[in-house]
Amino acid sequence: MERQFEIVSAYSPQGDQPVAIEKLVEGINSGKKKQVLLGATGTGKTFTISNVIKEVQKPTLVMAHNKTLAGQLYSELKDFFPNNAVEYFVSYYDYYQPEAYVPQTDTFIEKDAQINDEIDKLRHSATSALFERDDVIIVASVSCIYGLGSPEEYRELVVSLRVGMEKDRNQLLRELVDVQYGRNDIDFKRGTFRVRGDVVEIFPASLDEHCIRIEFFGDEIDRIREVNALTGEVLAERDHVAIFPASHFVTREEKMKVAIENIEKELEERLKELNDNGKLLEAQRIEQRTRYDLEMMREMGFCSGIENYSRHLTLRPAGATPYTLLDYFPKDFLIVMDESHVSVPQVRAMYNGDQARKQVLVDHGFRLPSALDNRPLTFDEFEEKTNQVIYVSATPGPYELEQSPEVIEQIIRPTGLLDPPIDIRPIEGQIDDLLGEIQDRIAKNERVLITTLTKKMSEDLTDYLKDVGIKVNYLHSEVKTLERIEIIRDLRLGKFDVLVGINLLREGLDIPEVSLVAILDADKEGFLRSERSLIQTIGRAARNENGRVIMYADRITRSMGIAIEETKRRRSIQEAYNEEHGITPKTIQKGVRDVIRATTAAEEPETYEATPAKKMTKKEREKTIAKMEAEMKEAAKALDFERAAELRDLLLELKAEG
């Protein structure tokens, strides 16, 4: 029986949500490939998207630009769809140091990773759900465009078991080993099985506490039961069960033999090429590493870093598009790109960064050239694989607007809250003026966000406010994701009243208690003060009925002008709607709860060693400057302004010393 998406919620669509839902559904049903939902902060974009999914009844991939945001969306969607399969698919690394080689110092960095077992389980749960049912929503980070094993292989290697089926017990054990399950009669955990006489217990890779107990009578399956793995309590009787592979990179034996032959052939060609070019060390290195991997694959059907051979294992030609999570979806599916102004540039950037690192490994004999095909999708490949897309953002980027010129707006908040009024005040005396405003807010038990241009200014301002007795905290780039969540929680609970930072646009900063957002040096045109950044920052004051924004500036820049006009336009639409429907704006009442503890991938941004510029050659300095400028622009594009500002300050120092 086909399951339908159904929303369980005490709310019904309000404000301009019904119109947005109707237009989006109409667009999808009429076959529109791309649509843009411009949803102002706090207008209930997730609820709108949930209603669209319910209306169109299509499996949906919701893409977020980081794990924390994906975690928040997963929690919200799980609340709206308790009877459907809402799954979570993000990188399963708690810590990830990719394999790399630094030729200048002849340093090889082994891949070092710590896999989060819980997230690995959720990833398996996500892929198996796509093969078992249609009512699936998968919330994913951009790791969903990285290579996965072939969905056909994954589907074909499912071990299907039914009551009454003729099956030799030992044959079942062999099949389980073929799909990467290990026999373990003592430490019974996910991805293992154990045998007790005529009873085989299997712990599927996608389950947490339940295992499947298969009871044989001779060569026939007599009974299938779902059992609590810890207590042995029988939870359910089953007529049929499908055991999905314990790894996404699984290959049938005959395919594995062909793959091993092809890898050996490639190795011989590569050795000849390296020896002909006099690269003897590289030749010895690649031969030693590859032969070891081949031996492991012959004996175990698996090796460490097997994903680097994925092109051979799936028998794809060189340069072919890799399989990703998108291939596990049926043809007719929907993609929702949340915060698309960040997600789209992020998808674009993935491929180039990955190739640059791998090319060095190939050149120096650490990997065969085919490893370059274990990669994320290019942007064009991603576009080809998408069916229908909804881009969701308060400030859609140029790409989204170009793809879908007709923007669907959602500006009215169900709470009646308005976009905040904006004051422009002179820079001279800004700190004293700001101090007075802060004290007014503290007296009313409200909170303040202050955004500055440089790290130094943030630190100085924080110190000054502390000295005059204000409870203040400073949010900077070194603060890890989970600490950020703690800081935001403490701000909401009133442990401090003011939060200072460079980049206040990251996730989780929509705080109802904030009634003032102060933007210092608002007239310094640049990536920190672009129209998109300003509109996003202004939105931080839109969850409180007393919300207000103060821009400290001596002139109105083009970006300021656009942001102010757009805010006024939205505010007038909201006021007219409130007047017509007799709505009085009310601050959002939102309980303070712990956000889902999503883990962070420890692929830290590059750090630049403090080599004095005087000791650098002219060429080295130019190279470092070019590299830092490129990284600064990338960081700015991704709205990671703290990192971009840090790099800008380093660049200024470097240029000055040069």
From Swiss-Prot:
Domain Helicase C-terminal: 430-596
Pfam families: Helicase_C, ResIII, UVR, UvrB, UvrB_inter
Entry superkingdom: Bacteria
Keyword Kinase on entry: no
Record InterPro entries: Helicase/UvrB_N, Helicase_ATP-bd, Helicase_C-like, P-loop_NTPase, UVR_dom, UVR_dom_sf, UvrB, UvrB_inter
Helicase ATP-binding domain mapped to chain residues: 26-413
Function in brief: The UvrABC repair system catalyzes the recognition and processing of DNA lesions. A damage recognition complex composed of 2 UvrA and 2 UvrB subunits scans DNA for abnormalities. Upon binding of the UvrA(2)B(2) complex to a putative damaged site, the DNA wraps around one UvrB monomer. DNA wrap is dependent on ATP binding by UvrB and probably causes local melting of the DNA helix, facilitating insertion of UvrB beta-hairpin between the DNA strands. Then UvrB probes one DNA strand for the presence of a lesion.
Organism of provenance: Bacillus anthracis
Protein name: UvrABC system protein B
Subunit structure: Forms a heterotetramer with UvrA during the search for lesions. Interacts with UvrC in an incision complex.
Family: Belongs to the UvrB family.
Annotated UVR domain residues: 622-657
Keywords: ATP-binding, Cytoplasm, DNA damage, DNA excision, DNA repair, Excision nuclease, Nucleotide-binding, SOS response
Localization per Swiss-Prot or TrEMBL: Cytoplasm
